[in-house]
Amino acid sequence: MEIYDDRGLQWAATHATAGRRSEAASFAARVPPDATRIDLGCGAGRYLPYLGRPAIAFDASSVMLDACRAAFPDALYVQGDVERLPFTRGSVGGAWSWMTHLHVARDRLPMALWDLHRVLAVGAPFEVQVLEGEYEGDALDGDEVGGRFFAGWRPDRLGDVVAGAGFAVEDGSLSVSGDEVRLRAVRSRTLADTVGEGMRMLVCGVNPSLYSADAGGGYARPGNRFWPAALQAGIVGKDRDPADALCAHGMGMTDFVKRATRTAAEVTVDEYRYGFDRVERLVRWLQPGAVCFVGLSGWRTVVGPRAVAGLQPEEIGGRPAYVMPSTSGLNARTSLEELTGHLRRAWEVGGGG
């Protein structure tokens, strides 16, 4: 942030015109009345006047926040890190991120969006614009400030990551203009992926239950035995804490299908197929040690109808695939000890131990 504290105001003075005012006004109209919206990486406030009120101006640079506050004193000003938002669950009604998340490393963006999903209310609009392309580093040609980190994105991969983070991308909104890619999305009543580089194992459920979606973590029902089995297997250290499971132990989590339902029986064959393709792209990108599918229904629907629990002959995204029985309390045929054994073996396949 020293770069922005030292040179940010000079850059802001030459970029004071809000070139996307109509998009900002359209975003403001989509935020529910009286709901708080947040300008992520507000800088000197180029778009803040057009986002509606009440508004949070959020930036990591105190110098930029001071300049913004002097021009627009009616907003709430918060200094912080876009990857660690200091807000409570469901407290924000909309998020505007214009050329902000492009400063987050590609393999860390899923968790930054997981945190954004956490603080946004269900149905909250989210608009994001980032750099288009494959560049990642701090020596971008044309960087007028100099020394800033940038991460470019292909449109299809950005759409996958946003969808995986629990957002419904609006049809036709994913677009490229010059060297920029942008999209509009809505925070869904579902779970966000907890994924990143260096995963020993990626756990893939069938789809979130409404109970888990509202709780903010997978396998959240008291009768579900996933977390007791994972703790007993020694692959996590905290109960029902997917972020800690990833960051402290290398266990990521996603789902075949992002749509939350009361029961997995509501998931359609087309949803399984679409979801499998998304998970395969995710695995090919992040290359976890292994992928453990919890519940056989998705794998049997898409890959092999006669599949049995255990290490599969087929890989996914070039990585080993392990399929295990459902951990639901309704699956009385499989004991906690058996579930623990499956998780331990899948973990070993992924290189854990």
Question: What are these model-derived regions, one by one?
Answer:
Residues 1-33, 134:
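Conserved class I S-adenosyl-L-methionine
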Residues 131-149:
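Short, glycine-/aromatic-enriched active-site segment of Class I SAM-dependent methyltransferases
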Residues 215-270:
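Short, surface-exposed acidic-centric catalytic microdomains
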